[in-house]
Amino acid sequence: MAGHSKWANIKHKKAKEDAKRGKIFTKLIREITVAARLGGGDKDANPRLRAAIATALANNMSKDTIERAVVKGAGGDESANVEEVRYEGYGPGGVAIIVDCMTDNRNRTVGEVRHAFTKSGGNLGTDGSVAYMFTKRGIISFAPGVDEDALMEVALEAGVEDIITHEDGSIDVYTDPHDFSDIQEVLIEKGFNSENAEVTFDAETKAELDTETAEKVMALIDKLEDLDDVQSVYSNANFTQELIEQIG
């Protein structure tokens, strides 16, 4: 099944991750810690923890670092006592954006998120204003050059929801969020190491953007991701490879 290329999106994201490795690791550790605090330290009995660990491993976090985060969360460390909040809004060009946060101070967090939206030509919306446009899914992405037939055989046997082969040869494997970590483990065992893997909110319909608007939306997403309390940012913007190249 062919689709529009998402490889450009992944390359853009990976470049930012490489440049901000410390901040990314901080967010991943926070997710592992909270997952362990809420659901216990046994990943086999805690799907959220299992998914958090899978994402951390995909980002090359060491097993020792992961284990320390699990122990910290499962032990009820006071510093792990943060709450999860979600904000929704619109960016430039009417792009729908979801911002997931973990915070010990809601007032601080909402102020920072609102400021980022306002300064970037967007606006913070109400609960539910854009969430209906997205579906929670696991996405495991592979770079161009992966053996498509072999990957498809293993993935289908593992129970994936969908497999999308893009025009540039990159492949996205979609899973139910509850099956994400189990399927990723199967793929790794069979020798298929992904370029990116995460449980995310996938937009049902993508917003097509011109170069100027795409640049503004990217700037907003960057501002949001730079906030300490922000864990993840999702949008329905269609950042095509052509747009990425034009923006540079």
Curated annotation (Swiss-Prot):
Family: Belongs to the TACO1 family.
Protein's UniProt name: Probable transcriptional regulatory protein FTM_1203
GO function terms (MF aspect): DNA binding
UniProt keyword annotation of Thylakoid present: no
One Pfam assignment: Transcrip_reg
Annotated InterPro entries: Integrase-like_N, TACO1_YebC-like_2nd/3rd_dom, TACO1_YebC_N, Transcrip_reg_TACO1-like, Transcrip_reg_TACO1-like_dom3, YebC-like
Main subcellular location: cytoplasm
Species this chain originates from: Francisella tularensis subsp. mediasiatica (strain FSC147)
